[in-house]
A protein has these predicted regions:
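Short, flexible hinge/linker loops that cap or flank conserved catalytic cores
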Residues: 1-2, 35
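Asp-based phosphoryl-transfer active-site loop
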Residues: 2-22, 43
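Active-site phosphate-binding/coordination module
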Residues: 24-111
């Protein structure tokens, strides 16, 4: 059993960000947690990196890693991996969403 936390992983929207606005306690908390050598801070979000920075401000620099765009972009330290969807898969999803009358938001994922 772990005697102390080894990491903080949080979603943003609907968890600590509501209506596009982060709880004012979030950035100071992330900085404090990241300042400890025994804790890694990671954000998992559907947002692109620029959207993450919009709500976290300069606190984004204290993150050890991030999972952005629902897993299509992974960052850990200075390493980055991208898992783009094929265009034909995107078209299938978009077509199905429109046929079902579902709202749809697509992000190209550039930083």
């Amino acid at each position: 059993m772990l005697s102390s936390p080894v990491g903080v992983v949080t979603d943003l929207d609907g968890t600590v960000v509501f209506g596009g606005v982060a709880d004012p306690r979030l950035a100071p908390f992330l900085r404090r947690a990241a300042g400890r050598e025994d804790i890694s801070v990671i954000v998992a979000t559907s947002r692109a990196p620029r959207g993450m920075a919009e709500v976290l401000g300069d606190a984004v620099t204290c993150l050890e890693g991030s999972v952005c765009l629902n897993g299509a972009l992974l960052r850990l330290g200075d390493k980055e991996r991208r898992y783009p969807m094929r265009a034909d898969h995107v078209r299938t999803i978009v077509d199905a969403a429109f046929r079902a009358g579902m709202p749809l938001y697509a992000d190209q994922g550039s930083s």
